[in-house]
Amino acid sequence: MVDKRESYTKEDLLASGRGELFGAKGPQLPAPNMLMMDRVVKMTETGGNFDKGYVEAELDINPDLWFFGCHFIGDPVMPGCLGLDAMWQLVGFYLGWLGGEGKGRALGVGEVKFTGQVLPTAKKVTYRIHFKRIVNRRLIMGLADGEVLVDGRLIYTASDLKVGLFQDTSAF
C-alpha cells in the first residue's frame, strides 16, 4: 500500500529513484543528475484544471547545476527538454502514488511551447501538472497538461503529456 502523502522531500524523491518509495514493482524516478525536481509540494487526486488530479513540484536553481556548464558555454541556459522530461517524470510519479506498478516510459506529448528560459540567475522552477485522464487497465497510463514557471513566470506549456507503466519493456 502506498503512503499517499500530499508532499515529498528530496530524500523521498531519491528513495523513489532507488525503488524504495512505491515498492519493488512501482515506478522509479531517475537518479541525479536527471532527477529534475527537489521536492513535490502538492499532490491531489482531484483539483487541477480538469479536477482529475494535480501535482506541483519545484527545482531550486543555482549556477552550479550541471547543464549550465555545457549548454551553452558563454550562454548558459537550462535545456528546454529537461523541463519537458520533468513533467513526464511527475506524471509517472503520480501513477506510482496512485498505486500503479511497472516501469514508467514517456509515450508522447501533444504540443510543447517555450516562451521563456531558465537562466543561472533564476531562483526556482515550478512544475504544475493537471491530469486529464488516468487509464488503469492492462496498460496504466496518465494523460495530463503541464506548465513550467521560473520565478513565478510561465515559460513552457505542454498538452497531452502521456506516460505509461509497463510490466515488460523488452518489446517497447
From Swiss-Prot:
The active site is at 71. InterPro entries: FabA (IPR010083), FabA_FabZ (IPR013114), HotDog_dom_sf (IPR029069). One of its GO terms (biological process) is unsaturated fatty acid biosynthetic process. One of its GO terms (cellular component) is cytosol. HAMAP family: FabA. Induction: Mainly activated by FadR, but minor repression is also conferred by FabR. This is 3-hydroxydecanoyl-[acyl-carrier-protein] dehydratase. SUPFAM superfamilies: Thioesterase/thiol ester dehydrase-isomerase (SSF54637). Belongs to the thioester dehydratase family. FabA subfamily. The gene is fabA. One of its GO terms (molecular function) is (3R)-hydroxyacyl-[acyl-carrier-protein] dehydratase activity. It catalyses: a (3R)-hydroxyacyl-[ACP] = a (2E)-enoyl-[ACP] + H2O; (3R)-hydroxydecanoyl-[ACP] = (2E)-decenoyl-[ACP] + H2O; (2E)-decenoyl-[ACP] = (3Z)-decenoyl-[ACP]; (3R)-hydroxybutanoyl-[ACP] = (2E)-butenoyl-[ACP] + H2O. It comes from the Bacteria. Its main location: cytoplasm. Homodimer. PANTHER family: 3-HYDROXYACYL-[ACYL-CARRIER-PROTEIN] DEHYDRATASE, 3-HYDROXYDECANOYL-[ACYL-CARRIER-PROTEIN] DEHYDRATASE. Signal peptide: none annotated. Necessary for the introduction of cis unsaturation into fatty acids. Catalyzes the dehydration of (3R)-3-hydroxydecanoyl-ACP to (2E)-decenoyl-ACP and then its isomerization to (3Z)-decenoyl-ACP. Can catalyze the dehydratase reaction for beta-hydroxyacyl-ACPs with saturated chain lengths up to 16:0, being most active on intermediate chain length. Is inactive in the dehydration of long chain unsaturated beta-hydroxyacyl-ACP. Pathway: Lipid metabolism; fatty acid biosynthesis. Irreversibly inactivated by 3-decynoyl-N-acetylcysteamine (DNAC) which binds to the active site and forms an adduct.
